[in-house]
Regions:
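Metal-dependent amide/peptide-bond hydrolase catalytic core
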Residues: 1-142
Length: 142
């Protein structure tokens, strides 16, 4: 017989990611030995963790606050485990990064981003473009 397992591995840092991959391989090898079967591990390199530049985060936060008001900006301090290709931009180019999100959902019981029932408040796009423009202009002044 044959079995197939597919999983997504998300980590908050490169070192932890390397350790996790080593552990997946070690555990699979052990299972193969324990059950006298062949196990093949195929790992596809996905998206790495995004590292936010603290100075750039300060600029993004202050610019967005100046443009939209303090009540419209929320600093997220906990790591975010969404899978995002944004990390490659910073890693490949060596460019400082600051990941920000724009909340365009609304309602009492919001649904997740990838839900077919999500409804975006398109008026938020104006605020988002306004904030990003301000951020870009402030960045260019430095």
């Amino acid at each position: 017989g044959e079995a197939k397992m597919v999983a997504v591995l998300r980590t908050f840092g490169d070192e932890v990611r390397e350790t996790a991959i080593e552990e997946v391989n070690r555990i699979c090898k052990g299972i193969g030995i324990a059950f006298a079967c062949d196990i093949e591990v195929n790992l596809e390199e996905g998206y790495a963790a995004t590292y936010n530049d603290s100075a750039l985060i300060d600029l993004v936060e202050s610019s967005a606050t100046a443009e939209l008001g303090e009540s419209a900006v929320r600093h997220i301090t906990q790591p975010f485990s969404g899978s995002e290709d944004f990390s490659f931009f910073g890693k490949l180019t060596g460019t400082p990064c600051a990941f920000m999100m724009i909340d365009a959902g609304h309602g009492e019981n919001p649904v997740s981003l990838h839900n077919g029932k999500i409804v975006f408040d398109e008026k938020v796009m104006v605020s988002g473009v306004s904030a990003m423009s301000r951020i870009a202009l402030e960045y260019l002044k430095k």
